[in-house]
Amino acid sequence: HLNQNYSILTQLQAFALDAHFLIEQSGRNQQGAFINFNGTAGIWRKSCILDAGNWEEDTLTEDLDLSYRAQRKGWKFVYRPEIKSPAELPPILSAIKSQQFRWTKGGAECAVKHAGKILKENHPLSIKFHSFAHLFNSTIFIAILLTSFCSIGLWWGVQLKVIPLELFWASGISMIGFVLVAGVYLVSYLTAQPYSWKSILGAVWKLPLFFSVSMGLALHNSQAVLEGLTGKKSPFIRTPKFNLESGSVSLQANAYRLRALPMSTLLEGGMGLLFGGMVLLGIVYDNFLFLPFHGLLALGYSLVFISSLRTR
């Protein structure tokens, strides 16, 4: 990551991408499961591309689409995590949003295109399972959005004593998944750099902030996923590149910056206020059941909203 230390946003992106490349991609490849070709550092055989049907333009993630078509025909990818390729991370939130929108919507489009075919084809059960989880992984943002709204109703239900407190504690089983996901990111982060107290302290603040910002992108990314699943088409929006290594490039002058303020940005500001209000209610009424969750949501949506206003 050429500009990993440029800002908190770039550090959080590096934190997430290291987990993807070091654990997710490596794990799938070692198990013989389908993985996605990475355009930053990947080499195709021309014969593979042609045999798989060449590039197609019916999804926003044409690399993921071609990867699945090739692997479904029996081609194998060789993943080499020790080989590094320099790449720039989006330094502003509008660029991150456009990239996230393309990735999540394109992933959903590929899920619609390939998931059913993979289930019908003669692949091992493990490959079908991993492929289904991989193709539909962007739906996690819809789950986050629904869970955040449901948490408000559950909080009021417990507060008004119309929902048994035991129901809340039963929902705590979801923490198992949270711990597992957190473990993946911690392992990848500590593996990607020299082990030291500095790296450990870095993980302490990056992990919760990463989860918070990811939650803050749930509204934006859920829209992308729903559009992908329902077949709504949209143009390919290029991720801006700023050449920050030169030290003389203005972020404001980039031609690919988003100038207009989307309605979703205003809704994100409203979500920040909503969950900030839930945090205050929890403190006022001594009902701290969802305080950490609502706190992360309030912080995440507020950061996304403010950063969107500053960098459009």
PLM-predicted stretches and their roles:
Residues 3, 87-88:
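Generic structural signal for helix capping and beta-alpha/helix-loop junctions
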Residues 137-235, 241, 262-312:
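Membrane-embedded multi-pass helical conduit in multi-pass membrane proteins
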Residues 231-258:
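Membrane-helix boundary/interface segments in integral membrane proteins
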Residues 60-65, 209:
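Conserved glycosyltransferase catalytic-site signature
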Residues 127, 131, 163-164, 243-251:
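Hydrophobic, membrane-facing alpha-helical anchors
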